[in-house]
Amino acid sequence: GRVLAPGFIDVHTHDDTVVIRHPQMLPKLSQGVTTVIVGNCGISASPVSLRGDPPDPMNLLGQREAFAYPRFSDYRRAVENAHPAVNVAALIGHTALRSNHMDDLHRTATAGEIAAMRVQLKDSLDAGALGLSTGLAYASAFNAETDEVLQLSEELTAYGAVYTTHLRSEFEPVLEAMDEAFLIGRHARIPVIISHLKCAGAGNWGRSPQLLAALESAAKTHPVACDCYPYAASSSTLDLKQVTDAFRITITWSTPHPGMGGRDLQDIAGEWGVSLMDAARRLQPAGAVYYGMDEADVRRILAHPLSMVGSDGLPEDPFPRPRLWGAFPRVLGHFSRDVGLFPLHTAVHKMTGLSAARFGLSERGEI
């Protein structure tokens, strides 16, 4: 027989600029995705007024010329004029706001800088933004104190807007990072969504029951959820804090050494006769795939009732992870049909109705 399903919602994308420059959106339409949520992990295309090259990890969205939207209303107008083949809903990135008002991203913001960020955030919410995202694990936001985010989150309350976060750590201190996210949600009385929940790093494998127990505990008194992608590898910029010989790391791009794209960091270091860390420093700025998760943890998180499906695909990456094109078919074909992790209707719910409800998307996710 045949199955009728709503268009899928990709809740975790970095399609901010590609929906304008490549509105056909073939990587998403080919999977059945009809709505994308952009602005995740603290990085968004707007509101941004760059004074130079985009800081890491905003460079995942494109080069300086891609950031042409000083106000969210400018970005919204550009998306509408591009007529992308998918619906677009947008978060405002904390790191994007910081880049507009701070001369040094490796510190916490001053009271005046926070006030300026709040004005921009409110203006964006007035223009239709869904909420605020943070990427506190990245160097460009890691030194932001919790109070900085608490103050920004207060702007979300009146709108019932959502707070999503790439946690301050997905490694050993992940539970403390989750507690920080829940604190922010309680403070502003807003829903919290933890981005790509995972147990990162070999020393962290097997801890998914602890993470999910913390999520369930928080959900008893507050609206919280998470998204995840159906793969045991992550992809982002090359982060020196994640350089290790405990698992494989593949370089996807490098500005000073473009020919190294597609090669393993271990091989590059061996060819150069240097340590992994020295090789990583030479390659930066660069992108990488980290094979740093355990399949059992991925399955456990994916199957949990509070988890949604998000691809976290990187359309600007010259060697993108398969999740850009294949996340949703992998959930349906591999995890639901072949593995039997959950029935088809549960798989569909995780990429439609649940997603629409958590992000407050009306007239989406249901038939």
What do the predicted segments below correspond to?
Residues 1, 12, 32, 88, ...:
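Divalent metal-coordination and catalytic microenvironments
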Residues 264-299, 329-367:
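C-terminal helical cap
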Residues 116-129, 145-158, 174-187:
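Structured alpha-helical segments in the cores of large, soluble enzyme domains
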Residues 18-20, 141-144, 169-175, 201-206:
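Acidic-and-aromatic substrate-binding clefts and catalytic sites of carbohydrate-active enzymes
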Residues 47-68, 73-76, 95-112, 185-192, ...:
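Polyanionic/metal-chelating signatures
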Residues 27-65, 85-100, 125-140, 157-169, ...:
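Divalent metal-dependent hydrolysis catalytic cores, especially in the metallo-beta-lactamase
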Residues 10-19, 101-115, 138-144:
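Active-site mouth loops of central-metabolism enzymes
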